[in-house]
């Protein structure tokens, strides 16, 4: 290849990559404390979304009276019926075990939980017959989790210590919510999915808070 052609190709490649390089450089200049602040804000909003959605579903369909305590326990804790894929992730069962995990491990688990929710959350609102409680749409819910996913990825990039995480990846994703709300099985399915959504987002917010206090604040009040 002629020298002039090679130079032209290199110049074209550099111009194509320039926006990405500028963006990557910009991320590196953002204070770590600010990245954590934004991620924690998104995580709190996602957790609150999960709580509000679960509570409205319970209230709208009278699920507390609809399902006995025995049925609820069996449905949520029986591995044959549980909808919580996060139960298959090698995570911690208590705060002491959580504190023993590295920052990257906690961020990695949080990322898996978020990614497992991206597709089904698109159809979250269609589960309900009354959306007046909410001022957000399916699209807003999706972009909330998408922003949180990107924020966690940025944090992982900034905290990368040269080690490579190996182990389980959560290739499974949660199924869509069932809009056939008058069907008994559909009600149970949606109940389980929303319970797990609340449980998973609580984990994400807790894990991010722990990584934040280790990385930025220097002390943890857990």
Curated annotation (Swiss-Prot):
CDD domains: somatotropin_like. Disulfide bonds join 213-220. GO terms for cellular component: extracellular space; vesicle. It is found in: Secreted. The keyword Signal applies. Zn(2+) binds at residues 44, 205. Keywords: Disulfide bond, Hormone, Metal-binding, Secreted, Signal, Zinc. Transmembrane segments: none annotated. One of its GO terms (molecular function) is metal ion binding. It comes from the Eukaryota. One of its GO terms (biological process) is animal organ development. Residues 1-26 form the signal peptide. May be a novel gestational hormone required to compensate for absence of other members of the GH/CS cluster during gestation. Belongs to the somatotropin/prolactin family. This is Chorionic somatomammotropin hormone-like 1. It comes from Homo sapiens (Human).
């Amino acid at each position: 290849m002629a020298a002039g052609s090679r130079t032209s190709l290199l110049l074209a490649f550099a111009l194509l990559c320039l926006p990405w390089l500028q963006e990557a450089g910009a991320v590196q200049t953002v204070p770590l404390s600010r990245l954590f602040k934004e991620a924690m804000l998104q995580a709190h909003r996602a957790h609150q979304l999960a709580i509000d959605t679960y509570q409205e579903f319970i209230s709208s369909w009278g699920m507390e009276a609809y399902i006995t305590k025995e049925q609820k326990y069996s449905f949520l804790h029986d591995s044959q019926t549980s909808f919580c894929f996060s139960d298959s992730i090698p995570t911690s069962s208590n705060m002491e075990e959580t504190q023993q995990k590295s920052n990257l491990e906690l961020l990695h688990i949080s990322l898996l939980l978020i990614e497992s929710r991206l597709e089904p959350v698109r159809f979250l609102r269609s589960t309900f017959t009354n959306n007046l409680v909410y001022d957000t749409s399916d699209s807003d819910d999706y972009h909330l989790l998408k922003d949180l996913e990107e924020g966690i990825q940025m944090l992982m990039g900034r905290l990368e210590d040269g080690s490579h995480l190996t182990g389980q990846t959560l290739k499974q994703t949660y199924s869509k919510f069932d809009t056939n709300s008058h069907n008994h099985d559909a009600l149970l399915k949606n109940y389980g999915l929303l319970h797990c959504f609340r449980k998973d987002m609580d984990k994400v917010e807790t894990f991010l808070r722990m990584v934040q206090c280790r990385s930025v604040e220097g002390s943890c009040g857990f």
